[in-house]
Amino acid sequence: MSNERTATLGVPADAEILRRKDEHLDLALGQQAQKRRSGFDDYQLEHCALPEVDLDEIDLSVEWWGRRLPLPFVISSMTGGPVRGARINAHLAEAAEALGLVLAVGSQRVAIEGAGEAGLGRELRRLAPTAPIWSNLGAAQLVAGYGVDEARRAVDMIEADALIIHLNPLQEAVQAGGDRRWKGVLGAMETLIRQLERPVVVKEVGYGLSAEVGRALAGVGVAALDVAGSGGTAWADIEGARSASAVDRKVADAFQGWGLETPAAVEKLRAALPDMPLIASGGVRHGVDAAVALRLGADLIGQAGPVLRAALESPEAVLRHFDILKRQLLIACFCTGSRDLLELRGANLSRRS
């Protein structure tokens, strides 16, 4: 595989990638401070004034790939340069281990290409010896030279239980120097899935998976889908904001509001693929949004941006974040009369007019 990459304005390619990761982190943090529209606002769970269940007996555990997880939460993929990225990943790993959460790491392309691990080495598994950890590579790399060897390296470097392949065509299209070659990705993915000894999860990065795309991915053997719909971190906006070109910024600006909103995408994917393990992420602000997504058919709930500031601070801050999310989800179950997540699937849900 060739490791040739184009540098930008004379900056070495590795340094350019690391700088981009740090800029992504700063801009993602800025987005979290903004109020953004969420598709979850269109849904309302019906309140049950007579729950006939004790709050303390509600069970939030979920079965996933034959394993019972204590909570239905995924720490979704994040990014960052080598110093902050290492700190973020260490804090997330400690919290994931303490709570039994799935930890889905950010893209490992930088580590694979030798520009620094950013905390994505064996230390991660040492900090989280029993938590499910998922490695991560970009789909566009599968038609740019990456194959099963690189996928195995991504898995092995953190002793991962699964591999995420992320789909980010819009981000790449508006990013200076982004990957424009996407023809053949599905076939390359099918080849990889046949050869890799780990299950493969496919996720978008913030613009959603349609039912049609979901069916195509199911057809090549993908083990789970992460909707990652709009309403959360908007990568086209971030790429526009970091661009030095006024023309590029104007191109990116046209895609504000682009994408499939998470709840609608979950609902359509679940109808199209009744048995597919499904993760809802993208714009999940709190436990009530999580309850709506679970009611619509999600099995797990992912958060990235909302966890980011806590992850920069400490493992304890991450634990506090998920304690709040857990308590909100518990109360949503309680106030719909649901003793567990299976009963929540049957709660009354309406669309706001």
Predicted regions and their residues:
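An N-cap/entry alpha-helix motif that binds or orients negatively charged groups
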Residues: M1-W65, L69
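C-terminal extensions of enzymes
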Residues: S2-L29, R295, I301, V307-S353
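Active-site cofactor/substrate anionic-group-binding motifs, chiefly glycine-
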Residues: E63-G114
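Hydrophobic faces of well-ordered beta-strands that scaffold small-molecule active sites
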Residues: F73-S76, L101-G106, I133-L137, D161, ...
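Conserved, mostly hydrophobic/aromatic
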Residues: I75, A96, L163, L225, ...
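A gly/proline- and charged-residue-enriched helix-loop-helix capping module
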Residues: A98-A139
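Metal-dependent enolase-superfamily TIM-barrel catalytic cores that perform enediolate-based chemistry
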Residues: G147-V213
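Glycine-rich phosphate/ribose-binding loops and adjacent secondary-structure elements
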Residues: K183-E313
